[in-house]
């Protein structure tokens, strides 16, 4: 073949003419027409090579390659453990309640695990203060709770928060007295703080709207009497401890009794009957206290019978 290698296959017409020329033994001199045909052939070859070069660019890594549908990574939900780590307290609590509602057979197992836990008194107080704050926040903005003359509209608006607070308070008190808690000092201190929280709650102008408060204070009075009974029976605590501790509780109880219109009079009298003096005085005071406790239990039973025969509210936490 005559001429240079141009990097492409020559046209069939050119090849045939070249072969025929060589066959005759004549030397073929490229003319202008042959050069023009080669130029056209070169352009056609470049057009054919261009799509192939694009494919090379596409599949060679320079251009982006569209992934096949089978190789796509699909999103998936979090595992159970990771999801529970992200859930807040309310979400976990609601989840547990829903599970126990749908599967009642697990309630006993959950309850057994819960009562086996040892919750600190400070944690209970923190929870009570949060619920007490919710009561204050539910007060209508146009009425002041300091006057203790909230109207019926305020009672309707505050009732859910009040019942939630009182229910929580009663549950925590029952969990922090003997035999659940054997430390009488801790029980008295916790009961003292709970009584103060109830006494300081805003009251309503209509007496019937204060029913839940009064009923709660009556129940607190029974708890006070119960703890005083434990103190009277434990002579070691009664004689060994500093009398100023008991007098401090008695002084605070007297203040609470004044703010509750005498609803705490009975435990106050029982406290005063305790004599933190000599052993003989303590023994005599214990006998008189036992007589007072018998009267207290009889009175409590009579009151409960009267309440059961009456028309008490169905949503009261103390019935």
Curated annotation (Swiss-Prot):
This is Tethering factor for nuclear proteasome STS1. The keyword Calcium does not apply. InterPro entries: Cut8/Sts1_fam, Cut8/Sts1_sf. GO terms for cellular component: cytoplasm; nuclear membrane. The gene is STS1. Keywords: Cytoplasm, Nucleus, Protein transport, Transport. Binds the proteasome. Interacts with karyopherin SRP1 and Proteasome subunit RPN11. Involved in ubiquitin-mediated protein degradation. Regulatory factor in the ubiquitin/proteasome pathway that controls the turnover of proteasome substrates. Targets proteasomes to the nucleus and facilitates the degradation of nuclear proteins. GO terms for molecular function: proteasome binding. It holds the Pfam family Cut8. One of its GO terms (biological process) is nuclear protein quality control by the ubiquitin-proteasome system. PANTHER family: FI02826P. It comes from Saccharomyces cerevisiae (strain JAY291) (Baker's yeast). It comes from the Eukaryota. Belongs to the cut8/STS1 family. It is found in: Cytoplasm; Nucleus. Residues 33-76 are annotated as: Disordered. The keyword Nucleus applies.
């Amino acid at each position: 073949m005559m001429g240079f290698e141009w990097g492409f296959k020559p046209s069939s017409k050119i090849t045939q003419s070249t072969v025929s020329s060589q066959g005759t033994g004549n030397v073929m001199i490229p003319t202008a027409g042959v050069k023009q045909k080669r130029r056209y052939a070169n352009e056609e070859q470049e057009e054919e090579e261009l799509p192939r070069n694009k494919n090379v660019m596409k599949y060679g890594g320079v251009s982006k390659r569209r992934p096949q549908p089978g190789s796509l990574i699909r999103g998936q939900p979090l595992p159970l453990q990771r999801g529970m780590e992200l859930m807040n307290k309310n979400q976990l609590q609601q989840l547990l309640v829903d599970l126990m509602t749908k599967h009642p057979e697990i309630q006993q197992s959950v309850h057994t695990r819960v009562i086996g836990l040892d919750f600190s008194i400070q944690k209970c107080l923190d929870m009570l203060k949060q619920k007490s704050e919710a009561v204050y926040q539910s007060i209508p903005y146009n009425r002041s709770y300091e006057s203790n003359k909230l109207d019926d509209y305020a009672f309707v608006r505050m009732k859910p928060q009040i019942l939630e607070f009182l229910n929580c308070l009663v549950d925590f008190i029952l969990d922090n007295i003997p035999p659940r808690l054997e430390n009488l000092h801790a029980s008295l201190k916790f009961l003292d703080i709970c009584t103060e929280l109830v006494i300081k709650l805003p009251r309503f102008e209509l007496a019937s709207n204060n029913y839940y408060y009064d009923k709660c204070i009556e129940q607190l009075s029974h708890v006070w009497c119960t703890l005083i009974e434990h103190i009277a029976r434990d002579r070691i605590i009664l004689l060994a401890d500093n009398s100023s501790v008991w007098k401090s509780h008695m002084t605070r109880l007297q203040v609470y009794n004044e703010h509750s219109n005498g609803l705490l009079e009975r435990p106050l009298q029982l406290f005063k009957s305790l004599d933190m003096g000599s052993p003989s005085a303590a023994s005599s005071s214990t006998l008189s206290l036992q007589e007072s406790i018998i009267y207290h239990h009889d009175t409590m039973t009579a009151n409960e019978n009267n309440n059961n025969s009456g028309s008490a509210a169905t949503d009261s936490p103390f019935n």
